[in-house]
Amino acid sequence: MPNVEIIVTSDGSHSLRNMEVDDTYHSIHGAVQESVHVFIKNGLMFFENQNHPSEIRILEVGFGTGLNAFLTLKHALGSKLQFHYTSLEVDPITKQTIQQLNYPEFLDFVGGTSLFQKLHAASWSQEDEIVNNFVLKKQLGRLQDIALGDQQFDLVYFDAFGPAKQPELWDVGILKKVEQSMKQGAVLVTYCAKGQFKRDLRSLALRVQTLPGPPGKKEMVRALK
């Protein structure tokens, strides 16, 4: 279990500071604000508007606090889409920390508290139906060690700690593994907009878009296969 402390970000939502990595799980300028901007609006909603799918398969690198999964689940509740959500995590947070996070109160929708707990209580390495159109599969382990398969995913939330803190997860070999797991037409989104990262994505024949970032951050990246 990670050594973390809860922090309050500028929009009032919680994040965690990992004391060993010396980094926060989200932007200090607003955790929910960042996740909505990067992953929901510029990832999920972009993919839906471009493709009008009947189902969507999502890969998340870094389950963390469960915020991205929770926001995606909230979106799914008002959707006819079928969601299959695979999330990788190497160091799950404790039940005590989970219970202190304020996302259910912050987002404040019917059933939110129980659904947030259900996401975290889901078993590892097997599919769990959270609601009838949202199936979660949490995978415990390192991205380097987990088999992703080829052309499995429509959308990737790449939400690892930054390249300065976890350079091994931003290595071009790892990015190639992720790219191979993406279907043709798939989308990858991340808060990171480092030059080397964008060059590596382009070397994998992905079309890289540099977009305005969330408050407090100049840019983010969306990559299209």
Which stretches of residues belong to each language-model region?
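Conserved beta-strand signature within the Rossmann-like core of class I S-adenosyl-L-methionine
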Residues: 155-157, 184-192
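Glycine-rich SAM-binding Motif I of class I
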Residues: 66-70
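Core SAM-dependent methyltransferase catalytic element
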Residues: 204-225
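Conserved S-adenosyl-L-methionine
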Residues: 62-64, 89
